[in-house]
Amino acid sequence: MNVIEDFRTGEPITLHQATNSVEFESVPNPLYMKLLWFERYGPIYQLKIQIRFNYNLRRALNLHKCWIELTITGSNRILTGPRFLKVLKKRLEIYLDNLGLICINNVIRGLNHVLYEEFNFVSSVIQNQSVAMNLY
C-alpha cells in the first residue's frame, strides 16, 4: 500500500492530517488541474495530469504544498487531452460536492471513483503525491 509522506521530512501523514477537511462550498475553485503531456499510440493514448490544491484550500487544511500527479492510459477516441481533463475535473467536483467535505483522502477517493468506476475506458493509472505540511 502506498503511504502518503511529507516530502520534506519523509514522515508519513497522520490520519488526522489526511482527513482534516473543510466544506466544499467554502473554498471557491479548490482544485487546479494541468495537462502536462498527451501522446497517442494508435487507438491507445497516455496523458499526464497534475492536480494542485489552491491557496485557500491549502491554508484551510494547514498544507504547505499538495500535488497529485496521474499518468493515465486509456482507449477513448473522443475523450482525450483537454476534453478529458475538463470532464475529469467536473466529475471530481460533483463527487466532492455530494460528499460536502474536501480533504486529501476524499480527493484521492474521488479520483479512484471517477477513473475506475465512471470511466470504463481507462486501463491504468499511476499516481504520485507530493505533500508538505506546514511546519510552523
Swiss-Prot record:
GO terms for biological process: rolling circle single-stranded viral DNA replication. The keyword Iron does not apply. Keywords: Host-virus interaction. The keyword Cell membrane does not apply. Transmembrane segments: none annotated. InterPro entries: Gemini_AL3 (IPR000657). Disulfide bonds: none annotated. Increases viral DNA accumulation. Enhances infectivity and symptom expression. Belongs to the geminiviridae replication enhancer protein family. Homooligomer. Interacts with the replication-associated protein (REP). Interacts with host proliferating cell nuclear antigen (PCNA). Interacts with host retinoblastoma-related protein 1 (RBR1), and may thereby deregulate the host cell cycle. Oligomerization and interaction with PCNA are necessary for optimal replication enhancement. This is Replication enhancer. It comes from Beet curly top virus (strain California/Logan) (BCTV). The lineage of its organism: Viruses, Monodnaviria, Shotokuvirae, Cressdnaviricota, Repensiviricetes.
